[in-house]
Amino acid sequence: MDKKYFFFDIDGTLTDIQTGIPVPSALETIKKLQDKGHFVAIATGRAYYKTKDTAKMLGIHNLVSNGGAALIYNDELVTNSPLDREKALALIHEADEKGFGILIAVNDSIDVVMKDERFIEQVGERQEPTRYILDKSLNYDDLKDIYKIYIAIPEDK
């Protein structure tokens, strides 16, 4: 039999969308595929730090996470690249000029930096665990790495 490659999303596919717990049918399917020698991986937009524990629960050792920027092969982190810095800064500056609240993940963790509290004022706190780091002297151009950008864009914009 030819080896096949299977990539699965997490929420609502491998785990219950409400609880985040792996569904029994997913665990059974993953095991069957792996036992037959197929390559099984997770493909998700989630950051790596939010994906690795779920992968471990599912017995999956390969991941494409962080929207394709992170690659984990046989439980080893191969790469986890930040966004293109110049494009990210252009987006951040445009959002800032328009008065939109901004949160920036500068590493692969629950930490986000912000220069003011506009994001929280405009849309409230994020629904997932987040540590907000308020730095009123934050100069976006001084940021070395940018992994994710969260922008509070009003519905009418």
What are the functions of these language-model segments?
Residues 1-3, 37, 99, 144-146:
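A general structural motif
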Residues 2-19, 42, 91:
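Asp-based phosphoryl-transfer active-site loop
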Residues 7-9, 70-72, 140-142:
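Short, basic/glycine-rich phosphate-binding loops at helix/coil junctions
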Residues 23-24:
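A positional/architectural concept
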Residues 27-121:
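Active-site phosphate-binding/coordination module
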Residues 94, 100, 105-157:
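Conserved acidic, metal-coordinating active-site core of Asp-based
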